[in-house]
Design a protein with these regions (language model features):
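Soluble, non-membrane globular domain cores that form compact, hydrophobic packing
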Residues: 2-167, 172-373
């Protein structure tokens, strides 16, 4: 079981206590800059040491989705947004098998090597993975779904992938709509639990909204996905329609409207944890104005990048690889080579006009040495 948050009394269900801290507080507490390489390659879970190689199959057996030449399956859920787009995508099957213990046991005093924090291919992806993981325990707890990732202990529904954007959270997998309905519509068992009721339907998904009117909150439930919107600043139903429409092919997708984004996804979007942005350039005034961004690529070397996709893939119990793709106005190849994948080995950085690609590898031995320095 994960440790209690600081300054909180011991409680067996501390994730579900009413005065739960903000996502930012918890990210800081769990060490948001702890890298996936550190989480996975140091003290890897026993599950990761099975004979079966983790992450070797791109086919998702749980929900039947398969990455195609047109892009990874999660990309179908990313609608064309006239503003900007940020996302975090997690192959939960792989991450759960490999690093679930490390995700839960991360401590605030974990020493993270400075070179990891300074590497755009490591820190942002790691923060994204933790954000997606913690969203379920934090944000979904208010709907009675806070333990959805707990390996069948509380739910018959199973999770294969997680997708987070600033407006929405998508749980992909084998979902039992009746089970979710029972949780959402149940009489609240605690003060902080919000009761919902079925009020609408969108393209085969049953839509639930709070019994007590709350702007910006709606949950769509289907047998292959659970789509959550909980942001009072948006029209929740419109957001659901846009995202479900993209997934069903009845609304425009970001990948279809942007050649640079499609290229970046094809190049670097196939990892076990993937983050990306399309829109406000990294380091721009528009990006700086948003102090709570989902994806943080605020590195001087990436200033002016309008499209970025970065991913980490778990190859086995000892090795992770990273892939990076960006479209940057007037990129500085020397400066980029100093940071992209610099904390790993087998580093490669290539600049072709405005297109930048990079790859690197992180091995258990290298990570262990870095943490001792």
């Amino acid at each position: 079981m994960a440790p209690n948050p600081p300054d909180r009394p011991p409680h067996s269900n501390w994730r579900d206590l009413p005065n739960w801290p903000t996502r930012r507080t918890v990210l800081e507490y769990t060490g948001a800059t702890a890298t996936l390489a550190t989480l996975g390659l140091l003290g890897g879970s026993a599950a990761a040491q099975d004979d079966d190689e983790v992450g070797a199959d791109d086919t998702d057996e749980d929900d039947g989705e398969t990455a195609t030449d047109d892009g990874p399956a999660y990309s179908y859920w990313l609608p064309d947004d006239p503003r900007e787009l940020e996302f975090v995508a997690v192959d939960w099957v792989t991450l759960n098998e490999y690093a679930s213990d490390e995700l839960e046991d991360a401590q605030p005093d974990d020493d993270v090597p400075a070179e990891f924090e300074a590497d755009p291919m490591i820190a942002p992806v790691s923060e994204g993975a933790l954000s997606a993981y913690l969203f379920v325990g934090l944000d979904l707890a208010q709907f009675g779904l806070g333990r959805l990732l707990d390996d069948g202990e509380m739910f018959d529904s199973t999770v294969s992938e997680l997708l987070q954007t600033p407006d929405t959270y998508v749980v992909l997998g084998d979902i039992d709509p009746a089970e979710i309905d029972e949780r959402l519509t149940a009489e609240p068992a605690a003060e902080f639990i919000r009761q919902l009721e079925q009020t609408d339907e969108i393209d085969g998904y049953e839509v639930y909204t709070p019994v007590e009117d709350a702007a910006g909150t709606a949950i769509a439930v289907g047998d292959d996905a659970l789509v959550v919107v909980d942001d009072e600043a948006v029209d929740a139903l419109a957001v659901l329609e846009s995202m479900i429409g993209a997934a069903r092919g009845t609304a425009d997708r970001a990948v279809d409207d942007s050649e640079s984004f499609a290229w970046a996804l094809e190049t670097a979007g196939g990892g076990d944890v993937v983050i990306g942005q399309l829109g406000a350039p990294a380091g721009s005034a528009a990006a700086a104005d948003d102090g709570d961004r989902l994806v943080d690529f605020a590195y001087p070397e990436l200033e002016g990048a309008e499209t970025i996709v970065s991913s980490l893939t778990i190859e086995d119990e000892e090795t992770s690889t990273g892939n990076f793709a960006a479209v940057i106005d007037d990129p500085d190849e020397t400066a980029l080579a100093d940071v992209l994948g610099a904390s790993g080995t087998d580093q490669s950085v290539d600049v072709d006009g405005s297109r930048v690609t990079a790859t690197a590898t992180w091995d258990e031995e290298d990570v262990a040495v870095a943490r001792k320095m």
